[in-house]
C-alpha cells in the first residue's frame, strides 16, 4: 500500500491538479462552442451538436501510397498500324502498290471490331477501266493504260472481198385476201406498190362506208406479218412527208375504231394500229433533226415540251410518261400538237384498265383530230419558216429531212376532207 501511495495516488494534491486541469479544458471549450453558435445562420431551427474532438482527429485524410505501376494513355491517333478505311457497300478495298505501311506487321488479334475489315496481303485488286456504276463521272473518264489494245482482232471479217448488199430475211408467202368488195381489193393492190400519193386519196365521207370491208383485210387478213413487215420497212426508211401520210392514215383509222366502239388492245392484230409505235419513234427522230422547230418556237415558247416529249420517247420509249407530261399544259404550238397526235394511238393501245385517266385523255385527242390535219400542220409550218428564215444551211437541212417524194408502199389510203 505504501508503494502504491508513493507511486501514484499518494497525496491529495494530485487529485486537485487533475480537477483543475479538467476545469481549464472545460472553460476553454465552452466559449468556442458559443462562438460557433453565433456564426451560424440566423434562424437556428435545429441546434448543431457540439463537435467531437476525437472524431475530428480520426477523420484526417490519409496520404495515398503511390503505386509502383505506371499508367500511360495512348491516343488512337498515335497507333503504329494503319486502320482500314471505311468501305462503301459492295465495294472492295483497294491497296496501293507503293504503300509504305506494309513494312510494319499488323496484329489484328487485339482489335476485335476491326477484324472483319482485314486487308488481304496478296496481290492488289484489279482496278476497272470503266467508271463506277453508282454516281456520275466527276473527274472525267479514266485513262486507259498505254499498252491496251484498240479492239479484238477476232471481230474483224474473215474474208476481204467487198460486199455489195446485206442479207435480209425474206417476206412470208402471200395468200389471197378474204373479201368480196372490189373497191377494197383494188385498195389492197395499190398498197403493195409505190404509186403516187394522189392515187391513194380517200374522202372522209367514204371511209365509214368502206370501214367493215376494209376491216376484213386490216384485222382478219391471213397475210398479217407480210403487211406489217412491209409497212415497217417503209416507215424505217421514210422521210417526213411519208411519215405524215402514214400518221394521217393511222389517226383516221383510229377514229373509226372509236365511232364503232372497238377496243384498243395489244392482243388484237391490226395492220395499221400495230405500226403506230414505229411511226411515233420515226416522227420523233425527224422532229429532233429539223432545224426549223427552233424558229417556230419563238412565237409560242413551248420548246421545253418538245424536248421533254422527244427525250421520253427516244431514250427509253416511255410513251405513257410522255402522255402524262402533255396533260400538264395547254398545247399552243403546232409541233406539240403533232406530237400529241402521234402519241395518242400507241398510248391507248398499251393502256391497262387501271390507267383510265390516260386512256380518256388519248380519246380526247383522237376526237379532236380532223382528216388531213398532220399534212396541213406541216405544210403551214414549213411555208412560214421558208418565208422568214434567211439561213441557207437551215433550208438545205430541211429539204433533206422533209424529202421531195413520199414512199407509199404499204399505205392503204390518205384521208382528205
Swiss-Prot record:
Single GO cellular component annotation?
host cell cytoplasm
Q: Which residues bind Zn(2+)?
A: 295, 385, 389, 394
- Chain intervals with Basic residues compositional bias: 120-130
Pfam families (alphabetical): Herpes_UL69
Query: What biological-process terms (Gene Ontology) are attached?
Result: regulation of DNA-templated transcription
**Location of the region described as Interaction with RNA in the Swiss-Prot/TrEMBL record:** 64-120
- Zinc finger (CHC2-type) in chain: 295-394
Q: What stretch of residues is annotated with the motif Nuclear localization signal?
A: 88-94, 118-127
- In this chain, composition skew of type Basic and acidic residues spans 108-117
How this chain assembles, per its entry, is: Homodimer. Homodimerization is required for transactivation. Interacts with host ALYREF and with mouse ALYREF2. Associates in a complex with RNA, and host export factors NXF1/TAP and ALYREF or ALYREF2; these interactions allow nuclear export of viral transcripts.
Query: What other note does the entry give for this protein?
Result: ORF50 and ORF57 are the earliest genes expressed in the lytic cycle.
Q: Which family does it belong to?
A: Belongs to the HHV-1 ICP27 protein family.
Listed name of the protein: mRNA export factor ICP27 homolog
Gene this protein is translated from: EJRF1
